[in-house]
Design a protein with these regions (language model features):
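Gly/serine-rich nucleotide phosphate-binding loop at the start of the catalytic core
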Residues: 1-79
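Positively charged, helix-rich recognition surfaces that bind polyanionic ligands
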Residues: 5, 171-411
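Generic detection of short hydrophobic beta-strand segments and adjacent strand-loop junctions
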Residues: 6-12, 145-151, 216-218
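Non-catalytic, well-ordered alpha-helical scaffold segments
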Residues: 19-22, 26-29, 75-82, 269, ...
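Short amphipathic alpha-helical coiled-coil/interface segments
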Residues: 25-28, 81-88, 253-261
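A generic secondary-structure signal for well-formed alpha-helical elements
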Residues: 32-39, 43, 88-95, 203, ...
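Stable alpha-helical structural segments in soluble proteins, enriched in small hydrophobic residues
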Residues: 35, 80-91, 377-389
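Acidic carboxylate diad motif detector
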Residues: 53-169, 311
């Protein structure tokens, strides 16, 4: 099976090619707005949808406003028009849904907006324009010698290169290299060996199993430390910027944000890789993960704890586990985790409301069973997450290994 993956490179403001990318992104914005004007005008005046083919024909022939010809390649211009068409498709789909379900909306969906006059827009080049030569991505002559050294060519399962996306950020560009790899057509068979993962803060991932092996905990304190430092610094510099220059965002704040995001992304990659490697090395073909959709709306935590929690992208970690698992043929099952923290695995309780009693979760992260047996609270939660998917899993052989899980650090 062929799947798509993305490799990212960062172009900062001090890069010699940065002004060139700014110019291209500005021209991309101009073309988007020009085409959007044509589509909006046709829709408002004649109630007709000007499609991609018509847009392309009109803009190619426009000699007065040559936004189309200002683009670095004809294919890059066409990609912008396709993005605009996609935006209009989304608009018409929203209108259709609004007509049937007005209660879901605050008002009628609005027409696709123009990009800011001084703004930038994404630039896309296809494999028609960007070629691989001797392991290097070579760009058209209009890119003045710009090249990239992609890492995806070193992958054993690499199939083909698709496109490059230049995504503008705050005084930076993210270069996204889109490529295809081959992954197993079928998942590895269910061998009856399961891992279950409870995601949290101090313990980023508490990982248990159904075969009596000692649980492991992937340390999350490194992530908390990164986030705590970032929040403290940003708060300070925001206050200074507002007081001194009446600004909401500065270059220093942008630099801090980029570094923080890079560190967290790196940590998440290492943690997800550790989990997948652990599953493969120990012959676990299925991974169950508790997914709490209301993480970001958590209101019962203190402000300090909540600040750390909402700043850590737990869903990003899950997505990394999912695509790495897909590469290896492992099965990942997401399940909601309600009532798992206050019901007892050792007492074979179902994780349902009638069994929920949070008072059994005592200090220092321990959970006490009805018989007085102590178990690590996150380990108990992880086992109850497994029970939501595999109700017949039991506590045989678990008591002796569940009190003190093995803590591992990935940074």
């Amino acid at each position: 099976m062929i799947v798509q993956r993305v490799e990212k490179h960062l172009i900062k403001q001090n890069n010699s090619y940065y002004p060139m990318f700014c110019d291209f992104a500005h021209k991309s914005k101009n073309l988007y707005n020009h085409a959007n004007f044509l589509v909006r005008n046709e829709f408002i005046k004649n109630d007709k949808w000007l499609r991609y083919g018509e847009m392309d024909k009109i803009l190619k022939a426009d000699l007065e406003f040559d936004d189309y010809k200002q683009m670095p390649t004809a294919q890059s211009a066409q990609q912008i028009l396709r993005l605009l068409e996609k935006d209009w498709k989304s608009f018409f789909a929203a209108i259709k849904d609004w007509n049937n379900h007005k209660d879901k909306y605050l008002g009628r969906p609005k027409l696709p907006k123009y990009k800011s006059k001084d703004g930038k827009h994404i630039l896309i080049l296809t494999n028609q324009n960007v070629k691989i030569k001797d392991g290097i991505l070579c760009f058209p002559k209009t890119f003045k010698g710009f090249t990239l050294n992609p890492q995806f060519l070193n992958k054993d399962n690499f199939v083909s290169f698709q496109q490059v996306r230049f995504v503008p950020g705050y005084k930076s560009f993210t270069v996204e290299l889109v490529y295809n790899i081959e992954v197993p057509d079928a998942l590895l068979p269910d061998n009856g060996r399961y891992l279950s993962v409870d995601i949290g803060l101090d313990n980023l991932a508490t990982v248990v199993n159904n075969v009596g092996d000692k649980p492991i905990v992937i340390n999350g304190k490194g992530l908390k430390s990164i986030n705590k430092y970032y929040n403290k610094q940003i708060s300070h510099y925001r206050e200074v910027a507002k007081r001194m220059n009446n600004k909401d965002y500065t270059n220093r704040m942008n630099s801090l944000t980029l570094k923080r995001n890079h560190k967290i992304d790196d940590y998440m990659h290492k943690a997800s890789k550790y989990l997948i490697d652990y599953a493969l090395e120990n012959d676990f073909n299925t991974i169950v993960i508790g997914n709490n959709k209301n993480w970001k709306q958590e209101s019962s935590m203190s402000k300090r704890v909540n600040q750390s929690f909402v700043g850590i992208p737990h869903m990003r970690f899950i997505e990394m586990v999912q695509y790495k698992a897909q590469n290896a043929g492992l099965n990942v099952i997401l399940t909601e985790e309600s009532y798992t923290s206050g019901t007892s695995f050792l007492d074979n309780e179902e994780p349902i409301k009638t069994n929920y009693d949070k008072s059994r979760r005592v200090q220092r992260g321990l959970f006490v069973s009805n018989n007085g047996i102590k178990i690590n609270a996150d380990v108990n939660g992880a086992y109850q997450i497994m029970r939501k998917v595999f109700p017949k899993v039991n506590a045989d052989g678990i008591q002796g290994v569940a009190l003190h899980p093995i803590r591992v650090s990935v940074a």
